[in-house]
Amino acid sequence: MSMSQPSIDFSASSVDVARSLIGATLLVNGVGGRIVETEAYDHDDPASHSFSGPTRRNQVMFGPPCHAYIYRSYGIHWCLNFVCRPAGHGAGVLIRAIEPLVGLDIMRKRRGLSDERLLCSGPGRVCEALGITQEYSGMSIDTPPFQLTPPLDPVPVVTGPRIGISKAKDVPWRFGLAGSPFLSRPFRQPDIV
């Protein structure tokens, strides 16, 4: 009897994908760790880049699921999103934080600091630590340089409002690994899902 590897269905809703990514392991060129924080965005969500329809900047969000959508936030930091829902829909999941596990020396060098809790605790920090830039946008995340392994066992997940946005701030589409010290920001009165 063979054991099948758990998988994440990227054609599902962004909320379901965001929740199922918590506890998954993400490596980029062999560097990375466990995903501990995500946020979901959908085409009918005023906080989503896809809300006003396809543009040159967000066209990857409207492509096939299971691809990387990279954009620059505030003209400074790269941010990594995973496209979900069927092509043409315009949905994604922002990777907000990971627990660094593999390639810590490389991450420390890229980030210029040693505190493991700060290496990947925020979307810009994730991209800097993992060496992710615009050139990765549109790449499939189920082939190198990406390696995504779903969690083998269920993990405790908390949810709450998304952060760092000006619209739809109360929508509880931020997900985190309960008790993780590697979150970008603690959850205020989190709900356990």
UniProtKB/Swiss-Prot annotation:
Keywords: DNA damage, DNA repair, Hydrolase. Its EC number is 3.2.2.-. It is an enzyme of class 3 (hydrolase). It holds the Pfam family Pur_DNA_glyco. GO terms for biological process: base-excision repair. SUPFAM superfamilies: FMT C-terminal domain-like. The keyword DNA repair applies. NCBIfam families: 3mg, PRK00802.1-3. Belongs to the DNA glycosylase MPG family. This is Putative 3-methyladenine DNA glycosylase.
